[in-house]
Amino acid sequence: IAIPVEPPITEYLHAKAARQGIPLSGTFELTPLCNMNCRMCYVRMSREQQEAIRPLRTAAQWLELGRQAKEQGLLYLLLTGGEPFLRPDFREILAGLHQMGLLISINSNGTLIDESVVRWLKETPPVRINITLYGASDETYGRLCRNPQGFTQVTRAIRLLGEAGITVKLNCSLTPHNAADLEGIFAFAKEEGLLVQATSYMFPPLRRDPSQVGCNDRFTPQEAAYYAARIESLLNGEEAFLERLKSQSWEGLCADPGEDCGTLEGEGIRCRAGKCSFWVTWEGRLLPCGMLPDQGADVFQVGFAEAWRQAREAAAGIRLPAK
């Protein structure tokens, strides 16, 4: 088991796109609705909460946005939510975007994927489905996700996808509610021959409820560091982990892969956000990154090209604090 690394061609294309301001990769957040209710989620809403803000964007709107983004250079597209498979028109959206030649990945909790879903996924297969594994038992799913059948549902989905030849990558969001399952999650991944990418850091729920920052279901900094080291040990083996500690090769030990954030005060951001990647929220705001609480332009109103221009400008103006 190892943390997946992007192919060199993907890194090269993103580096070139960043220099030229081309939106090579993006995310469409199709819905804030989800059939689960995870304690640490930053975006989930009930249907009533969502409708009070605005109706969901239609399949036709998302497909038109895909066409506009492709004209500007989009190639790698992630479809996420909420839970995208909860949308009755998700098949239509996926098929339309697939026909445009985009390389599509899907984020899902996996619990809604059954035989009928797998059959139509095989017709327009995504490059990969990223399934978050929240525990190694139904009990943990009940405690963290409020779905007491979740583990049974997702493991069945993972096996169905594997039998259909659809690539699956496992993600693991570690919290105080499922930390005891960490070894079990890695054991399951090994048994299924799957990659697993785990993190002990949860973004604060700025978009869902800013008042909960610092109060939500996350580790303390000390706990997050401990579990980051534990994850490193499980990924590379305890012997290699101990050798690394002895050699004092700490660089990157607790950092997420691909994360390259500078620490000098006043320095600009180094990641791809607003340089060659973007995120469109379910309401239609185009942001440099989905974790930013900024408003962003309404991409369905001003069009993709203008919304992307504004996102690039916003990202270029971000400066890092000293701490």
Question: What are these language model-derived features?
Answer:
Residues 25, 274-275:
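Short coil/loop residues immediately preceding or within conserved phosphate-binding loops
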Residues 1-128, 227-230:
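Conserved alpha-helical substructure of the radical SAM core
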Residues 1-16, 20-22, 261-272, 283-323:
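Flexible mid-to-C-terminal extensions adjoining Fe-S/redox cofactors in radical SAM and related proteins
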Residues 84, 112, 174-177, 294:
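Short histidine/acidic/glycine/proline-rich micro-motifs that form metal-
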Residues 32, 281-282:
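Short, ordered coil/turn segments that flank beta-strands lining enzyme active or ligand-binding pockets
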Residues 122, 132-134, 139-270, 282-287, ...:
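Radical SAM enzyme [4Fe-4S]-AdoMet core and its adjacent flexible, acidic
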